[in-house]
Amino acid sequence: MPTRLDIVGNLQFSSSTDNGDEDQEADVTACFVLPSPSSFSKLSILDDPVEDFKEFLDKAREDFKQRWENPAQNTACLDDFDRIKTLGTGSFGRVMLVKHKQSGNYYAMKILDKQKVVKLKQVEHTLNEKRILQAIDFPFLVNMTFSFKDNSNLYMVLEFISGGEMFSHLRRIGRFSEPHSRFYAAQIVLAFEYLHSLDLIYRDLKPENLLIDSTGYLKITDFGFAKRVKGRTWTLCGTPEYLAPEIILSKGYNKAVDWWALGVLIYEMAAGYPPFFADQPIQIYEKIVSGKVKFPSHFSNELKDLLKNLLQVDLTKRYGNLKNGVADIKNHKWFGSTDWIAIYQKKITPPSFSKGESNGRLFEALYPRVDGPADTRHFVEEVQEPTEFVIAATPQLEELFVEF
């Protein structure tokens, strides 16, 4: 399966629902969103372990508010870095491996062309991404080291995670075992619990946006669709296979869409394919809003029960959106063996191999081999792009990017 498209815009879709809602119709716009093969964590909050996660979230909200209301700007410049190679390209920019001249550290530099960002109507998403990245701080989320702009481009400098995307490892080995899927899912649950406590919706969960480091832990990357929302929002964005039914039906939605996406991700990790797929997006949407899910025979009863409660079309029954919030997910029997604090503190090693699984491909997926901080072997796309580029002599579209 090729890397999937993100979509942003409106959607042409028509569906009758059991509750008598009228059909919804609009137009669809599809675009590639530049992947961010990178990851960064500012100060390690594991240096001061927290036994009470709720206590941590209270403190995290205070720290986030301070950074959100006082966003950092122009914390470096292009001349501070040696540009080594292009790691990937997208419709309005590219990601480059760079080396910070003063520290010698390697980073992934996300470079966005201002004119292309404007042409593709991604100004708001780009400004949101930068503001969110400079304000968040959590072990399983990509954070930003530096950001700056010049006459032509916007720059976000992120720690380079050389283990590569979960997507490529999952496609290579087929599927993950339930213990391995649970190990990864637990990190996503904690990350979403953190984001949602800050009124942030992620909206773009998929294996392509999950990086695996050399210790086997995840980093969620690409916050281009993330948004701070206290109530509901109506923007159509995401990846077709991962869209919640309320997004497709243009009903307005809240943080519950992330928990639906978690269900899709867990299913895809454990099965090797998503629960809703077809040749055309419209066919995918029809399957999603139908609410019908077929499970592989090897899924445990506990896993099937969890997925039935996450892939729940009825928002009044979907786990994560009920009175107990995320506790319904964390206390589910499929997560019965999960030590949530130990996961947060990164004290848990990936589950041991079961008989028949101990092969090179699986080991490489769980513990990606890297030879040094600049190893790019897990970024399989060979991109022939020059490391030098022309910067405009005069400011372009400056008024649109004042907040960057």
UniProtKB/Swiss-Prot annotation:
Which EC class, in a word?
Answer: transferase
Query: Protein kinase domain location, by residue?
Result: 81-335
- Which amino acid positions bind ATP, per UniProt? 87-95, 110
User: What molecular function does GO assign, one term?
Assistant: protein serine kinase activity
Q: What is its EC number?
A: 2.7.11.11
Q: How is its activity regulated?
A: Binding of cAMP to kin-2 regulatory subunits induces dissociation of the heterotetramer. The released catalytic subunits are active and able to phosphorylate their substrates.
Q: Tell me the keywords, alphabetical order.
A: ATP-binding, cAMP, Kinase, Lipoprotein, Myristate, Nucleotide-binding, Phosphoprotein, Serine/threonine-protein kinase, Transferase
Give the GO biological process terms.
Answer: positive regulation of oocyte maturation; signal transduction
* Name of the protein described by the UniProt record: cAMP-dependent protein kinase catalytic subunit
Species: Caenorhabditis elegans
